[in-house]
């Protein structure tokens, strides 16, 4: 679902640079991140077919549909705002865990992917995209606009939905 949202961001983009960043993000999600998850699942006995056909959990539906609906009903900022906590969050978690040496190597490849240079580069690029989109659409005094309050609310909601998404693993 997040690949679809980033694909929609290409359409909602105002310029070629935004389109490139969104397209690179889609490429990273589909051609690298999905491969990681498929390999991890296979390693632990979950086939690609079972993974692809798995029933989507309610918390995942809530988060991903919130993002998509934000994009369908709003503009570029409305769409990318709820995407940011996921991208930046994974980069931060990966970075914080990169020197962690657990006795159980179950998550080693996950940590290497999200702390790795490629994902960190994507994360920084997405952060710059967000900053640039805010300035180009709302101006230097963005924090005084009505839209800024909406962006803050969307971001906070997305963070809470991202937390719920992570908590699914504990259920």
Question: Could you tell me what each predicted segment is?
Answer:
Residues 2-23, 71-72:
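Helix-loop segments that flank and shape redox-cofactor active sites
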Residues 123-138:
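Short loop-to-alpha-helix "cap/lid" segments that border enzyme active sites
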Residues 19-125, 156, 160:
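Active-site-proximal alpha-helical scaffolds that flank and shape metal-associated catalytic sites
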Residues 67-69, 137-145:
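Short, charged/polar, low-complexity loop and linker segments
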Residues 145, 149-171:
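Acidic, carboxylate-rich catalytic segments that either coordinate divalent cations
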Residues 8, 12-16, 43-47, 100, ...:
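Surface-exposed helix-capping loop/turn segments at secondary-structure junctions
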Residues 5-9, 39, 93, 168-169:
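Amphipathic, soluble alpha-helical interaction motifs
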Residues 1-6, 89, 163-166:
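Hydrophobic/aromatic-rich, well-ordered segments within soluble, folded domains that form packed cores
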């Amino acid at each position: 679902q997040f690949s679809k949202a980033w694909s929609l961001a290409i359409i909602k983009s105002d310029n070629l640079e935004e389109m490139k960043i969104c397209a690179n993000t889609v490429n990273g999600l589909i051609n690298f991140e999905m491969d990681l998850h498929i390999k991890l699942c296979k390693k632990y006995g979950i086939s690609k077919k079972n993974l692809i056909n798995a029933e989507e959990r309610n918390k995942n539906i809530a988060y991903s549909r919130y993002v998509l609906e934000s994009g369908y009903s709003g503009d570029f900022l409305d769409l990318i705002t709820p995407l940011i906590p996921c991208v930046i969050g994974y980069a931060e978690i990966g970075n914080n865990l990169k020197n962690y040496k657990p006795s159980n190597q179950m998550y080693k490849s996950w940590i290497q992917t999200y702390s790795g240079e490629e994902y960190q580069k994507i994360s920084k690029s997405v952060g710059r995209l967000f900053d640039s989109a805010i300035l180009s659409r709302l101006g230097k005094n963005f924090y005084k606009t009505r839209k800024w309050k909406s962006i803050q609310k969307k971001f906070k909601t997305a963070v809470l939905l991202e937390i719920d998404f992570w908590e699914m693993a504990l259920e």
